[in-house]
């Protein structure tokens, strides 16, 4: 397939630049993978679409304030976007500057901190903090929330709360697992009271999630790598859910990628726990082994995420659903509305 097959025209006014007043006040478009039927609903209607005994799997990564501003010793300004924390002092990062910093040069950050340029790894720079504090402490002190480029505004204080799920736990993401932004504590409590099981995986979403696909042929795309963890407890819950004839519902494409990465690593054996880097690329033709349904936001044209959704529910059904969403003026991308999608028949 061609990357251009996943293109669509989106009016600029449908890009959500701020979240709804309440987390669960967004709209929900349902898409049945079995028959391609669409239905316009409210996000709170999701409660009626999840059955007792179903297992909902959330990504509990915490978004770090990963954007830093500073200047080189020459006085030139630069912007750092953390891709990954290597340890308490070192990061891999994207650096935006008129000229790339050279090895061993020092970078002065806002707040009086300094970083040293250690090495370059293709498009990423390895930087070391010159401070008694940890990277995480410095980010919490002077870092900015890494809003996606299409939101096209400076981050605000409210983004520290709203560009973060209510169940976040493990710091490391530089982009939010956005399907989870719609859930508040009350809705999670209601789902549990209904008999829905809740589980958590971790995938630290990297800045690569915003990188465009730069090839014409889908098969030639090289996926960026991210760290994920699927515990034995989650594996056991999945086995129990499947054995009882119930569904595994992934909240967000990052949860999907975590679970299917574990399945890929397990090979032909029963599902096993997984912890490590994953570069899984899911596109039409992929055989899903774990996930039966998913909650997801509306994704960018020609992105790997709309390819994943097309693999899950069928290419034609997804493109038709997106045209419907545009016609009905759904809000798109990270702060936008959501979909509930069931897997297409084999």
From Swiss-Prot:
The family this protein is said to belong to: Belongs to the QueA family.
Record keywords, A-Z: Cytoplasm, Queuosine biosynthesis, S-adenosyl-L-methionine, Transferase
Catalytic activity line of the entry: 7-aminomethyl-7-carbaguanosine(34) in tRNA + S-adenosyl-L-methionine = epoxyqueuosine(34) in tRNA + adenine + L-methionine + 2 H(+)
Gene Ontology MF term list: S-adenosylmethionine:tRNA ribosyltransferase-isomerase activity
Originating gene: queA
Protein's name according to its UniProt entry: S-adenosylmethionine:tRNA ribosyltransferase-isomerase
Primary location group: cytoplasm
One of the GO BP terms on file: queuosine biosynthetic process
Functional pathway: tRNA modification; tRNA-queuosine biosynthesis
Database matches in InterPro entries: QueA, QueA_dom1, QueA_dom2, QueA_sf
């Amino acid at each position: 397939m061609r990357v251009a097959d996943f293109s669509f025209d989106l009016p600029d006014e449908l890009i959500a630049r701020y979240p709804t007043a309440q987390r669960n006040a967004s709209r929900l478009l349902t898409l049945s993978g079995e028959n391609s039927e669409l239905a316009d609903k409210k996000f709170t209607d999701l409660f009626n679409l999840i059955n007792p005994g179903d297992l909902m799997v959330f990504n509990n990564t915490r978004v770090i304030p990963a954007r830093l501003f500073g200047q080189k010793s020459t006085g030139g300004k630069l912007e750092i976007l953390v891709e990954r924390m290597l340890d308490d002092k070192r990061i891999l990062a994207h650096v935006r500057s008129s000229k790339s910093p050279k090895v061993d040069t020092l970078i002065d950050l806002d707040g009086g901190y300094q970083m040293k340029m250690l090495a370059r790894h293709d498009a990423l720079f390895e930087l070391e903090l010159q401070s008694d504090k940890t990277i995480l402490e410095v980010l919490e002190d002077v870092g900015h929330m890494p809003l996606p480029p299409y939101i096209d505004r400076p981050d605000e204080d409210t983004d520290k709360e709203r560009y973060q799920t209510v169940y976040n736990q493990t710091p490391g993401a530089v982009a939010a697992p956005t399907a989870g932004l719609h859930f508040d504590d009350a809705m999670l409590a209601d789902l549990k009271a209904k008999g829905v099981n809740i589980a958590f995986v971790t995938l630290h979403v990297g800045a690569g999630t915003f990188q465009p696909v730069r090839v014409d042929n889908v098969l030639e795309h090289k996926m960026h790598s991210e760290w994920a963890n699927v515990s034995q407890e989650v594996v056991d819950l999945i086995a129990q859910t499947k054995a009882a004839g119930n569904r595994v519902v992934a909240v967000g494409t990052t949860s999907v990628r975590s679970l299917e990465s574990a399945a890929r690593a397990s090979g032909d054996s029963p599902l096993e726990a997984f912890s490590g880097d994953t570069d899984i690329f899911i596109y039409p033709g992929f055989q899903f082994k774990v996930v039966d349904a998913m909650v997801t936001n509306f994704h960018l044209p020609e992105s790997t995420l709309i390819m994943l959704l097309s693999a899950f529910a069928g290419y034609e059904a997804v493109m038709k659903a997106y045209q419907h969403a545009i016609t009905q003026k759904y809000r798109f991308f990270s702060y936008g509305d959501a979909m509930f999608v069931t897997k297409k028949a084999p």
